[in-house]
From Swiss-Prot:
Keyword Cell membrane applies: yes
One GO cellular component term noted in the UniProt record for this chain: plasma membrane
A GO molecular-function descriptor: serine-type D-Ala-D-Ala carboxypeptidase activity
Protein name listed in UniProt: Putative D-alanyl-D-alanine carboxypeptidase
Its EC number(s): 3.4.16.4
Gene3D superfamilies for the chain: DD-peptidase/beta-lactamase superfamily (3.40.710.10)
Family: Belongs to the peptidase S12 family. YfeW subfamily.
Record key words, sorted: Carboxypeptidase, Cell inner membrane, Cell membrane, Hydrolase, Membrane, Protease, Transmembrane, Transmembrane helix
Superkingdom of the source species: Bacteria
Any one GO BP annotation for this protein: proteolysis
Length: 432
């Protein structure tokens, strides 16, 4: 009996000795962690000027040394209904949820992959065909190589796929047209390569659509259920979901995006296209029409606090509090720049050369990594300065500047606030 008791005590002590307790975020004043508060405050006026000039809204949060030192919202979550300015626009708050667009790639798909790699359930050198049956070259394909594509090739964006096949738009997609998830997977298999794999980088949504399907194959769960139940819920995140309107959230909690659906103010048309102001539905066309709102490349919504926790997980080397999702070796593996391009890690964008200045500014360390999203979102994680910045915005919630010339340029996209690096530099420049 004594031996059993002693053994139990020793085992408990042994396990507790190896338990990892990761830092959790607390709130501190900027001065407490090395910022000049007066300099940092200047950013407030500059962002407000951008809002006054027509930028819809900006939510900003800054982390330094495990502390939230700045969290603020400017502008409006919804100011238009169609082309009509609302008499009483809805103000953005620090709790407003935003369509993350391509930041979904990192904080849903990459987080899931990093967890699965750490758990030994997948290897980045595995062939894609191991998880997606029928993923192979098609008769008549001019460029061959699908059979040999590895997950690491997909993550590095060197797999040969086009940037945006526009599956839901039959006028563009042609035989690859799809507005259902099951058909979309078959169309991805049939999508011809545009260049020889490994010969160059082409940032492609298709790559991350494939990765989403791979995660579902391994886990036997829909992507949204997997990340929401095994990552977000254990972290205590309450505002990070796919398809928020189907999960208890209401439009006033969410920032609106494009004014006239996906029509770019009336110049784009295809079957089932949305025409009302988008509010609580993912903006991305492939994610909405072709994937039902849940895709590896887009579809995730979140707020700045939840994003701060996810960025802190990365700064911590894979955990938060008493929760371990992956380890520091996995973080290093995924954020190390590729041999071919210093600006690409495994999915993550890395501050590897001057081409990333518009994203990360000129003052962040070369080891900084993160991602951007088409709707106006940025995440920047700097392990050298133990610092992270998240900017969430709803840039498409403004008129298209000139629909006939370029339907993808919005009036707000012409403002300086659309260049994240300037904001990032003002934050770094406020360090003492």
């Amino acid at each position: 009996m004594k031996f059993t008791l002693v053994a139990t005590v020793l085992l408990t002590f042994s396990l507790s000795a190896f338990a990892v307790e990761y830092p959790v975020l607390t709130i501190a004043s900027p001065d407490q962690v090395g910022f000049d508060s007066q300099k940092l405050h200047r950013l407030d006026g500059w962002i407000q000027n951008q809002i006054d000039a027509g930028y819809p809204s900006i939510n900003l949060l800054v982390i330094k040394d495990n502390h939230i030192v700045l969290q603020k919202a400017w502008g409006y979550a919804k100011k238009y209904d169609g082309s009509t300015l609302l008499a009483h626009p809805i103000r953005a708050t620090t709790n407003t949820m935003y369509d993350l667009a391509s930041n979904t790639k990192m904080y849903a798909t990459n987080f899931a992959l990093q967890k699965l790699v750490y758990e030994g359930k997948i290897d980045v050198n595995d062939l894609v065909s191991k998880y997606i049956p029928g993923f192979k070259d098609m008769p008549g394909d001019k460029i061959k190589g699908k059979d040999k594509l590895r997950i690491i090739d997909i993550l590095h964006h060197v797999a040969g796929f086009p940037a945006d096949p526009q599956y839901p738009n039959k006028n563009v997609a042609g035989k690859l047209f799809s507005q259902s998830k099951s058909t979309t997977l078959e169309m991805i298999k049939k999508t011809p390569l545009e260049y020889q794999p490994g010969s160059k980088h082409i940032y492609s949504d298709v790559d991350y659509m494939i990765l989403g399907f791979i995660i579902e194959s391994i886990t036997a769960m829909p992507l949204d259920r997997y990340v929401e139940t095994t990552i977000y819920k254990p972290l205590g995140l309450k505002h990070t979901v796919f398809n928020p309107l189907m999960k208890g959230f209401t439009p006033p909690q969410i920032a609106a995006t494009e004014l006239h659906g996906n029509t770019r103010d009336g110049v784009i048309h295809f079957p089932n296209i949305r025409t009302n102001t988008l509010w609580g539905q993912v903006h991305d066309e492939k994610a909405w029409y072709s994937m039902g709102g849940v895709s590896g490349h887009a579809g995730l919504f979140s707020d700045t606090h939840d994003m701060a926790v996810l960025m802190q997980v990365m700064l911590n080397g894979g955990g938060y509090g008493n929760l371990k999702l992956f380890d520091d070796k996995t973080v290093a593996q995924f954020t190390r720049h590729s041999p071919e391009d210093a600006t690409f890690g495994l999915g993550w964008r890395v501050n590897g050369n001057a081409s990333m200045t518009p994203t990360f500014g000129v003052l962040a360390s070369p080891q900084t990594y993160g991602h951007t999203g088409w709707t106006g979102t940025l995440t920047s994680i700097d392990p050298v300065n133990h610092m992270a910045i998240v900017i969430l915005g709803n840039r498409p919630h403004s008129p298209v500047a000139n629909p006939k010339v370029n339907p993808n340029v919005f009036v707000s996209g012409l403002l300086p606030a659309a260049t994240y690096g300037w904001i990032v530099d003002q934050i770094y420049g406020s360090l003492k």
